[in-house]
């Protein structure tokens, strides 16, 4: 399923879609950051600090470094909350193409 906005994400979760491609850069970057937090490669406290204090650059894999702003940190935090509520785990299949696999009930 191709994701263009947050409503598409809610729809994908409702329908338990297992593979998505995110066309929206902000949402795609938020997914990449959320994936780093879920995998223990980025402490969640970093998102909290960014939401309060500004921006930073984070390496998300495959040589891609993205600027993380307050807005992006807030979006990533919302995603992580939704993932926790539904016991969803994401797997980054391709960083540059923003392709993700979603596992439910893990």
Give the residues covered by each predicted segment.
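Acidic, low-complexity, intrinsically disordered interaction modules
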Residues: 58-64, 68, 72, 76
